[in-house]
Amino acid sequence: TEYMKDDAYPAIKLGAEVCYFNGIGQARELEKLCIEDTDAILLELPFTQWNKFVLQDVIMLMEERCLTVILAHIERFYAFQTRKKIWKEMLELPVIFQVNADFHDNRKKRKVVKKLIESDKPLILGSDCHNVENRKPNLISGYDYISDKYGKKMVEQIDNLGREVLGFDTK
């Protein structure tokens, strides 16, 4: 990664989107899956109705493991939460909510993100880029939408939180 330290390239850190499993809060060596040089873990919750065990595991990651929990693409999960109690409890936790930049292409996802923003929840933006063909980098469209809808200050707030979580200087 030495060649990537040139100012012409954006800083890149090794990280993983960690798929939730029952008991993850007690998993050994989980810290190895944190984003490089941070205590932040990007956690993908199950695409099913969450229960108290999922909630307890997330709490354990924060309180007992002292990790900064980032819930990956949170806007995708609302539709799976037919019983909203756990959803609401999850939204009250001191986690960071990561949303994908393409959230604005879907009315229900826009609504979820709007509620997060209006509730002043900590938010970061991700691209969910897997390749340059069918899952292309799309951060610009996400930032443009947020800027148009919520203002440049919101974009700066999201960007600064991302920098802070990754251990980069904030402006």
Language-model segment annotations:
Residues 99-102, 127-129:
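Short secondary-structure boundary segments
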Residues 1-98:
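Extended substrate/RNA-proximal surfaces in nucleic-acid metabolism proteins
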Residues 30-32, 87-90, 113-117, 142-145:
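Short, hinge-like loop/turn segments at secondary-structure boundaries
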Residues 85, 96-98, 104, 108-112:
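A C-terminal functional module that forms or caps the active site or interfaces directly
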Residues 121-137:
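Short acidic/histidine-rich active-site segments
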Residues 19-21, 76-80, 104-107, 130-134:
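Active-site environment of divalent metal-dependent phosphoester hydrolases
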Residues 139, 143-171:
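Mid-to-C-terminal alpha-helical segments outside catalytic/metal-binding sites
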